[in-house]
Amino acid sequence: EQAVSQAEAGAQILDVNVGAPGVDEPALMEQVVKALQSVVSLPLQLDSSHADALERGLRVYNGKPIVNSVNGEPEVLEKVLPLCKKYGAAVVGLAIDKKGIQPGAEDRVAIARRIKEAALAAGIPQEDLYIDCLTLTASAQQKDVLATVEALHTCKTELGVRTILGVSNISFGLPCRTYLNTTFLTMAMYAGLDLAIMNPSSEEMMAAVYAYNVLTNRDPQSTRYIERYANRVPASTALAQANQN
């Protein structure tokens, strides 16, 4: 039900995480991948920290999946990258290692560079690697927010890799989260973000994506924007009209 709902809302990829206390994660991953592919045609991102669960999902997947994720730890790279190569999967690389998330952009880029080198050495094409520079919460680490955007931009321009980001983490613990999420999403897209992990049911965030694609010429003749919004009235306009009646 969630998969169908998110697909209808405009999601382009579905993240699949079945980890929970007491469950057989490998078996459940296989079961869920099969079930999802029977009801939606969207690509799936298999999200697990356990290589055995990832392989069970990869084994039954039809098409090209995304593995979420590896990080800068050598033992993780050694376990997961061969699976990605074996099954032809793209892979998300988290800019984190045993030291945790580094506050500065340069340290995160250095980890991303190590991940890129390991992926290429494992035979994974560069275009199949997505780097996640990791979003820190503005409520707790406000001074480090821009470091994520800077690291993302450097990964895009200097490392030449694709990028992915969990956008809504930015607003955790703060009121009116949509305002922060939408603004941060726009900042990240301008810095070179390729994939946003976000709620497709958030009309404000989806509107930001569609509008951004028009303004950056990614949506020629505004075709997709017009298809989505030609017959819609913005919520603020609808509310104003209702108050006048």
Feature names for model-found ranges:
Residues 15-20, 42-50, 65-74, 143:
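Catalytic beta/alpha-barrel core
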Residues 48-49, 63-79, 115, 196-203:
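Phosphate/diphosphate-binding loops
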Residues 1, 7-17, 37, 62, ...:
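Gly-rich Lys/Arg/Thr-decorated short loops/hinges at beta-loop-alpha junctions or inter-strand turns
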